[in-house]
Design a protein with these regions (language model features):
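Short, well-structured alpha-helical segments in soluble
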Residues: 67-81, 180-194
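Periplasmic-binding protein-like
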Residues: 83-89, 135-136, 194-201
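Conserved beta-alpha
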Residues: 102-109, 113-170, 261-266
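Glycine/small-residue-rich loop that forms an oxyanion/phosphate-binding "nest" at active or ligand-binding sites
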Residues: 73-120
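N-terminal glycine-rich anion-binding loop in soluble enzyme alpha/beta folds
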Residues: 2-73, 140-177
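Hydrophobic alpha-helical segments within soluble ligand-binding/sensing domains
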Residues: 70-71, 75, 115-130, 226-238, ...
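Hydrophobic alpha-helical
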Residues: 182-216, 228-229
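C-terminal functional extensions of proteins
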Residues: 223-267
Length: 267
């Protein structure tokens, strides 16, 4: 064995020295991880994923079932990583299960982490952008769409226009093309009473059309994935200025994902 030898090594601080972010992704989601890879190309930010079992068909009944599996999904993100923030990636799930319940289940496994979900992130984004009257676009059934609209209205964000696709199959949601989404955003957001648009659902591919839609409308556009990425960065202590400086090292331009990325957390 004289040709085999033990070699010396040293350790450094590892990945995620700017921020360690955890993400709980639905089993059926085709989009969230891909869009986060685009939006979190920031030097020193590490993002780790766990998957949670869910039904392909999106109904209030199937959504509420996820709260049983949420602790296991959170547990698969190792506590030893000392996450700064963890996001549960389902807007409709957070609506039906409840934002506080989602946070409680994740915090039971990661008590020192900040927690978010796309619904909570949307509310924070509306506060940061000072949006009070929004148009809402969803792929959901009328029942799930109404539950989300009611939740936003109850939080003080008036939903003045609503459009939905009525798709219960999450696989199909992930295949809705960019032109369909762009045209829907413009049609809803063009109404004068709307000061912005929220596109709900982590499966919808919105990230790469946000900038174009904002230019067309002259109004902010928020998506579930964009809001969640922004909120998790801010909760992790990555300010707008820091994110811009760190992203320049990787050649990324965060402004391409909307005006939201220029905003701090609301007070």
């Amino acid at each position: 064995m004289d040709h085999v030898q033990q070699l010396p090594y040293s350790n450094d601080a590892g990945l995620g020295q700017t921020a360690k972010i955890g993400l709980i992704v639905l089993q059926t989601d085709q989009t969230l991880e891909d869009e986060f890879r685009q939006m979190l190309v920031i030097d020193g930010v590490a993002c780790y994923h766990s998957r949670i079992a869910n039904a392909m068909h999106v109904t209030p009944q199937t959504l509420v079932q996820m709260q049983t599996d949420l602790p296991l999904a959170a547990r698969l993100l190792p506590q030893a990583f000392a996450f700064d923030a963890i996001g549960y990636g389902c807007t409709s799930g957070a609506t039906i299960i409840g934002e506080a319940q989602v946070a409680q289940l994740i915090l039971a496994e990661h008590p020192s982490a900040k927690v978010s979900n796309p619904l909570t992130a949307c509310k924070a984004a509306c506060g940061a952008l000072k949006l009070n009257n929004i148009a809402l676009l969803t792929p959901y059934s009328p029942h799930v769409t109404q539950a989300l609209s009611d939740n936003l209205n109850a939080s003080g964000i008036k939903v003045c226009r609503t459009g939905y696709y009525d798709i219960e199959d999450d696989f199909t949601v992930g295949r809705v093309d960019a032109n369909s989404i762009f045209n829907a955003i413009v049609a809803l957001g063009a109404h004068a009473e709307c000061d912005g648009v929220f596109v709900s659902c982590t499966s919808l591919r919105v990230a790469n059309i946000i900038h174009r839609a904002e230019q067309k409308l002259g109004k902010p556009v928020i998506s579930s994935n964009q809001a969640l990425a922004w909120h998790l960065l801010r909760l992790s202590g990555v300010s707008h200025k820091s994110a811009q400086e760190l992203s320049q090292k990787t050649g990324q331009k965060l402004g391409q994902f909307g005006t939201l990325f220029n905003q701090p957390l609301p007070n």
